[in-house]
């Protein structure tokens, strides 16, 4: 457990450095939210209706933007080989790296959501509801994205390949995240059903993601 804690702290420190990826994701999220009101126009009701979808889409794209460095940097400097040969199971190491990625890249987006939601004409209860759905759903984006990041490393491809692999897996999270947000804000549909499915997607990805990523890395590093 001490080794996993050290790995999490190391990845968070690297991500928070200039050029480490976390700041890039937050700035991209901020850019998406700030530019959308100019694209939508002066219709504040339309902007508020689109607000949850804009916030969720920004979070998805920001997460995708930073996923390519999840394993690639360690692969380039040889750290990934040491992690694979360590006594700690590779599945737990993958889970620790995904957790560090979420803490450095996903959690800041959730914290910023209540403030940025005001730019989309959402009131405080509405932005709080969106932040709650992001808290439940963004782990699924990270842990499913980890599978694509591992495949991109083993196939020595990044960028477009990662997007092609991850986006289909992220669509259900996006659908139920937006549905839960809209149900909490406007109704009349129940908030509980889509939110429960969103939590279930995160739990399933939490279990399946590390094992799938570890299998991919083992085959790629052999």
Model features per residue range: what roles?
Residues 1-25:
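Aromatic- and glycine-rich beta-strand/loop motifs that create alpha-glucan
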Residues 19-41, 56-59, 165-176, 202-209:
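Hydrophobic alpha-helical transmembrane segments of multi-pass membrane transport/permease proteins
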Residues 39-50, 114-135, 181-197, 220:
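Membrane-interfacial helix-loop-helix connectors in multipass membrane proteins
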Residues 51-67, 71:
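Long, hydrophobic alpha-helical segments
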Residues 64-84:
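Transmembrane helix boundary and interhelical loop/hinge segments in multi-pass membrane proteins
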Residues 95-120, 140, 144, 177-178:
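Hydrophobic alpha-helical transmembrane segments that constitute the membrane-spanning cores
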Residues 128, 133-167, 218-222:
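A structural motif at transmembrane helix-loop-helix junctions in multipass membrane proteins
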Residues 205-222:
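Junction motif at the cytosolic side of a transmembrane helix
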């Amino acid at each position: 457990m001490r080794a996993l804690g050290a790995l999490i702290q190391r990845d968070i420190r690297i991500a928070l450095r200039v050029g480490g990826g976390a700041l890039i994701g937050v700035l991209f999220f901020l850019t998406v939210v700030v530019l959308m009101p100019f694209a939508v126009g002066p219709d504040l009701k339309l902007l508020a209706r689109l607000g949850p979808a804009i916030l969720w889409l920004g979070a998805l794209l920001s997460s995708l933007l930073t996923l390519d460095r999840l394993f690639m940097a360690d692969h380039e400097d040889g750290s990934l080989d040491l992690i694979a040969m360590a006594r700690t199971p590779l599945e737990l190491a993958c889970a620790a790296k995904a957790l560090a990625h979420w803490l450095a890249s996903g959690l800041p987006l959730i914290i910023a959501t209540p403030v940025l939601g005001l730019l989309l004409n959402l009131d405080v209860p509405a932005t709080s509801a969106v932040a709650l759905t992001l808290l439940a759903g963004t782990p699924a984006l990270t842990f499913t994205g980890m599978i694509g990041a591992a495949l991109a490393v083993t196939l020595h491809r990044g960028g477009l390949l990662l997007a092609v692999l991850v986006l289909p897996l992220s669509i259900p999270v996006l659908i139920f995240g937006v549905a839960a947000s809209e149900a909490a804000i406007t109704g009349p549909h129940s908030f509980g059903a889509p939110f429960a499915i969103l939590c279930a997607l995160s739990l399933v990805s939490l279990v399946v993601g590390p094992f799938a990523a570890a299998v991919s890395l083992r085959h790629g590093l052999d």
